[in-house]
Structures are given as C-alpha cells and as structure tokens.
Amino acid sequence: MDFSDVASYFSRMEETTKRLELTSILAELFKRSGDDLKKLVYLVQGKLMPDYLGIELGLSDKLIIKSLSKASGRSEEDINRIFSRLGDLGSTAEEISSSGIQRPLLKESLTVDYVYNQLIKISGYTGHGSIKTKMDAYIDLLINSGPMEIKYITRIITGKLRLGVADSTILDGLIEAFSEKKYADDIETAYNFHPDLGYIAENLMMGNINELLNAGPVPLIPFKVMLAERLQSISDIRNKMGHNASYEYKYDGLRTQLHFLKGGIKIFSRGLEETTSSFPDIVQNFKSYYSFDSCIIDGESVPYNPETGELYPFQMVSKRRGRKYELTEKTREVPIVMFIFDILYLNGKSLVNLPYPERRSILEKNFKENEYFKLAKRIVSDDEHDIMKFFERSIEEGCEGIVAKSNGIDSIYRAGARGWLWIKFKRDYQSELSDSLDLVVVGAFDGHGRRKGTFGALLLACYNSKDDTFETVCKLGSGFTDEMLSEMPRLLGDKIVEKKPARVNSSMEPDHWIYPSLVLEIRGAEITVSPVHTCAMNIIEKGSGLALRFPRLIKPRDDKKPEDATTTNEIIEMYKAQKKVIEKS
C-alpha cells in the first residue's frame, strides 16, 4: 500500500472528533491494507511495536532540524523559526518539503513497507556513528516523500502523531473491518491478555477468531491488570457482594506482574512497561526461593524497613525506576517486598477462569512466604465489626485500606476490567471525599503574580471509557510546591497543542491545550453539580455535569496511562454515595 494513501486517511482522521466516523475511516483503511495490516496498525498508533517491547526511535527534535537543514540547504535558525511559528515539527517538515528540496532522479516507491522498515532501521542504530546513520535514514524518507507524507512520518518519529484514536477505537475499526460485533467483548478480552494490536489485527484478518476467543495469559507477555470499583462503606460492600467475600490489605506500592518461564523472569508495571532491570533483588530472590516451570503472579511491590517490617510510602519505589547507575545502592537503600495477591498461570496452565478462592488456595500451596515475598493479608468474613477491625489494622500497618474480593463462582480474573468482583475501601466519609481521584491534565492557565511565567492552574479531566473521551472535572490551582510549579512547563511543554485534542470534551477554554498524557492524583472536598464541567453532562441534571470542589494535588502518577484515570462512571457513583451519606447524617 502506498504511504501517500495512508497519509490521506490520516488527514481525514484529523478533521473529525466523532468516534463513529473515526472508526469507519479506520475500518476502510484496514480493509485496503492487505499484507501491510500489522505494520499499518502499529503506525496508526504512532509506534513500531507493542509498548512492552520498549522500541524507541531515538531521533530528537534537534536531530530532525539538523536533517531538514542538511536536505534543504536552509539554516537551522531558519528552520527553528518555522518550528516556533507552527509549533509542530511535522508541519515544519511539510513546509520545508513544499518549498523545495533536492530529490533523487529515481525516487524510492514510498510504500507502508518501505516507511516501516526505514523506521525500524532508525530504531535499531546504536553506538558509534549511529546519529549520522539515523539522520541519513530520515533524510532518505524526506527526499522520497511528498509534503503530506513527511508530515506524518515526522510526527510518528517524534511520538506526536495524535490522530485522536485510542486503542479501543482501533479495536472497533478492526472489528468493523474483519469481524462481527457479537465478538467485540471476547476480542477485547483477548487484547487485555495480549496487548498487541498487531497480533489482534493479524488474527482477525486471517479469520483466526478461535485463537482470540481462547486467548489467555502468556508468560513473558504483559497483561492489563484487573481493577477494583469503590464504595464508601463496609455495609454497601457486603450488600453488593451478596455477603460472600474475602478482604485483603490494599498495599501502597507499585502494581507488579511477575512472569517466569524456563529460568527467565520479566517484571512489568501496571502500564505494561518492563521494569525488570529496576528490581534485580526481586529477580534474584524469586529464583532462589521458588522452582516452577512457568508462572505469572500479580501483586504489589512495597518499600519496607527489613529491621522493623515497617512499610514505606509508594513514592520511595519510584527512586529505582529508570536508574541505570547507582541501582545497587538504591536497592540497598530501598528494599522491596512483593505482596502477592493473585496467580494467573502455573506450570503451563492458565488459572484465570478459576474462581478467586481456588486461585488463592493455589497461591497458598505453592508460595511459601519469606522476607521478600509475602501473600496479601486476608480474612474471610461477613461480620461488619471484624471487617472494620481488619480495615483499621491495615491503616495502622501502612496500607491504603482494604479490597473486598468476591468468593462467588463467577469470580474469575478479568484482565483490564474494573468491575464489582473487586471493591476497594479506603476510609470513612468525613469532611471530604473518601478516596482520591486520578485525573488527566488537558489544559493549562497562565499564572499571575507570584506564578507569572509559569502555569497558574491546570484543567483536569476524567476518562469516559464508553465514549473514549476525556471530560473536564476541575481546575487545579493548589497543592503545588514552588518546585512543582516551575517544573510544569518543562513536563508539559511538548504536550502543548494548538487546538483542543480530539478526545477532549470541554466547554472551558484554557490558555493552553494539553495533549492527554500526564495523570495526577487529586483529593477534593466533594463532588457537586456544575454547569461548567463536562463530566457526566446531562446524566445527573440536564445541562450540567459534575465537578470536584477544592481540588488539591497529592502526587503525579507516572505509573498510569491517561486511560487508567478515574472514569466518568466512578465519579457518578462517588457523587451518589456521597449524597447518600449526607442524607443519612
């Protein structure tokens, strides 16, 4: 398939914010792609491979500007001026290409296959001379492309394709192109266990629907973890669970999935990032204490004091992440214990369709506790007094609260799902909300007075999982330290976009639109009906949405993707629960 055709489809996608229209455009594109489908699906995502493989192109804005200068004969200063005016390197490359560059007499045929393979080459070049080789490969794409093609190729390289489609929309496009809607839930389940859209696309195109219907966990391939809903009283939880639940501590750590196969171990975060290199102690200790052919476990890695057993806050784990140097020292400074609360796979057999009590029993039989690996503390009870005592003990021992888990026969492991099989409970409703919210930055307002020259406030949104959009819920201006405030323009600078991102639903107009990427943990006083914010618009009250009053920043959540943010439905449930508590008091 010619990449010029792909660029035309990308242009059409940029012109709409309607999800159904985006899905139809994608379906049409996928049907035309033929053998290029798998590569094309990755390119639509702005990637070359699934995230968990960690492939990076490694061509910075500065190197692209140098390449544009070399190919066009224009100075880097001139190109930087164009970049400043347009605010987008893809559009800059388009303008440079339009204004004339020296092209070869015999141009390469710019197919999807050719573009993809050139990008793979760019990602693979390392070591001495790699910068020149990467630049030459980009120039090769530039001189063989038309203006529109190089615009999108450059955006893919810089990680700023931003077509307004999330993985769920791409899945819908694939289903419309190659399958039937009746299989949609099963295909989504397959994707949650095997989060590689190229793999899903290939199987759908080849008619291998049974491969996807039978999909389950695969050692060394990360899965989307199961998540919990929330309620604000033990009584509500008992009623929701049908008085048939277990209760576990909710640890304040880093969600960790550990995969073991034939002596090899991989560790992944909640966001599917491989973090094996950050936890050499977990790897070494697992091999020392356990002997399996294969297994996959789900748990929480928590920093602790080995002398006292005291658990430390989550933020201390982050000191290890991304460190290549001084890791041995950090491992000594911040020892880790992994609290295991689920098992998905053992010795060649998937366990995800077993009820939770059976999976827990398998854990207890096969994982003997030691200093480095412990099972999540648990009780099985329907006595409200006992459950509350267990909750209070969890707080005393440094946890966030407890998680109720259904003991019913339907209590399977639902990858990627947030449902009522697991319900978290953090603390009683008092003067403010019983739980924090994870919200996405979608806009910024310029500061005044002491905050002049930086951002004064941020526009935050929740995630509407049904519509695949981000709906505004509050304007955040408190909880920042001076250091955080000065860092915000740097953190968000390359996320600033000229117009409202396609997936953002907002009636407010910030000074700067921010592409949804940064997640912040926020606490507030209460959720109120709002004519300004779009969260749950027209659901509670006609012409109004829901807003968080008096929001304040707790901490950034760099372990979460935008789609992991608090959902619209969760905020609706929190509003209803809050209203019920107020009416009782």
From Swiss-Prot:
Enzyme class: ligase
Obligatory cofactor(s): Mg(2+)
Coiled-coil zones: none
Active site: K250
Transmembrane domains' residue ranges: none
Swiss-Prot/TrEMBL keywords: ATP-binding, Cell cycle, Cell division, DNA damage, DNA recombination, DNA repair, DNA replication, Ligase, Magnesium, Metal-binding, Nucleotide-binding
InterPro entries on file: ATP-dep_DNA_ligase (IPR050191), DNA_ligae_ATP-dep_bac/arc (IPR022865), DNA_ligase_ATP-dep (IPR000977), DNA_ligase_ATP-dep_C (IPR012309), DNA_ligase_ATP-dep_cent (IPR012310), DNA_ligase_ATP-dep_N (IPR012308), DNA_ligase_N_sf (IPR036599), NA-bd_OB-fold (IPR012340)
Keyword flag Metal-binding: yes
A Pfam match: DNA_ligase_A_M
EC number: 6.5.1.1
GO molecular function, one term: metal ion binding
Residues annotated to bind ATP: E248, R255, R270, E300, F341, R418, K424
Catalytic activity: ATP + (deoxyribonucleotide)n-3'-hydroxyl + 5'-phospho-(deoxyribonucleotide)m = (deoxyribonucleotide)n+m + AMP + diphosphate
Gene Ontology biological-process entries: cell division; DNA biosynthetic process; DNA recombination; DNA repair; lagging strand elongation
Family: Belongs to the ATP-dependent DNA ligase family.
Classification via HAMAP family: DNA_ligase
UniProt-listed NCBIfam families: dnl1 (TIGR00574)
PANTHER family the record matches: DNA LIGASE 1, DNA LIGASE 1/3 FAMILY MEMBER
Role played: DNA ligase that seals nicks in double-stranded DNA during DNA replication, DNA recombination and DNA repair.
Protein's recorded name: DNA ligase
Lineage summary: Archaea, Methanobacteriati, Thermoplasmatota, Thermoplasmata, Thermoplasmatales
Designated gene of the protein: lig
